[in-house]
């Protein structure tokens, strides 16, 4: 994955912050990230925008001053700093339905062989855990298709749509900068702790979110024709420690 530490206008909980809170190196070079991806004992990596496109990252202050969402926010997620030798797939979340067509066209133009867009809550890649979810996707740069998924069919029974934040969040440190109303780093640590617990097989909403998102990804990549089988495989690697082993194998 790739991203930034924080960005206007929402200054939310980025995966940069969550991974850093989990003890991961978020300053890898593009080559270091590529090496981790190609290592079968690791198989994943994060590379920051500061490393793969410093000129774009230098616009952060300007974007903060503009405040409102800019067009660059839509297209920067498709930069794809690391590409596969055979195929490269794009996976992201969307909130507003009109964006699916836009992202699909952009993904094709950017050279992504496959594209998977999941109807989510802002900033995530997991559908609602308690109601039917929808994805739009294409294979081999073809036309978009739609698919509905019911979390109950995967054995997911939750009363919440997503893992809830605590009722009382740590207040943001005093600063002259425009920022979120809560301490983003402290909340990122909460998210990291919940994620590590789920990777260690602790069941709950975070565990179910991992099962759901990963199962959809495996289904889209045609690793499993049946998403229920994909979900069972994800549970297996969460419960036997393999998923956590791969997470810890990364820098």
Kindly give the residue locations of the regions a language model identified.
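A glycine-rich phosphate/pyrophosphate-binding beta-strand-loop-alpha-helix module
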Residues: 1-31
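Glycine-rich anion-binding loops and their surrounding alpha/beta cores
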Residues: 20-27, 32, 38-251
């Amino acid at each position: 994955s790739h991203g930034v530490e924080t960005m206007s206008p929402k200054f939310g909980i980025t995966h940069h912050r969550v991974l850093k809170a989990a003890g991961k190196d978020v300053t890898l070079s593009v080559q270091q990230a590529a090496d981790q991806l190609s290592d079968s004992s690791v198989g994943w990596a994060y590379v920051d925008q500061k490393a793969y496109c410093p000129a774009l990252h230098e616009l952060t202050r300007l974007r903060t001053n503009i405040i409102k969402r800019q067009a660059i926010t839509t297209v920067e997620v498709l930069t794809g700093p690391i590409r596969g030798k055979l195929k490269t797939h794009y996976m992201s979340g969307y909130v507003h339905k009109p964006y699916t067509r836009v992202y699909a066209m952009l993904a094709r133009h950017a050279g992504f062989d496959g594209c998977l867009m999941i109807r989510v809550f802002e900033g995530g890649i997991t559908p609602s855990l308690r109601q039917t979810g929808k994805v739009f996707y294409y294979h081999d740069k073809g036309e978009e298709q739609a698919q509905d998924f019911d979390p109950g069919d995967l054995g997911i029974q939750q009363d919440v749509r997503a893992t809830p934040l605590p009722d009382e969040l740590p207040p943001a440190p005093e600063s002259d900068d425009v920022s979120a109303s809560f301490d983003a780093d402290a909340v990122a640590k909460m998210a990291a702790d919940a994620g590590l617990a789920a990777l260690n097989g602790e069941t709950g909403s975070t565990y179910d979110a991992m099962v759901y998102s990963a199962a959809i990804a495996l289904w889209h990549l045609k690793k499993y024709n049946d998403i229920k089988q994909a979900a069972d495989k994800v549970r297996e690697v969460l419960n036997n420690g393999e998923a956590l082993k791969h997470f810890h194998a990364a820098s």
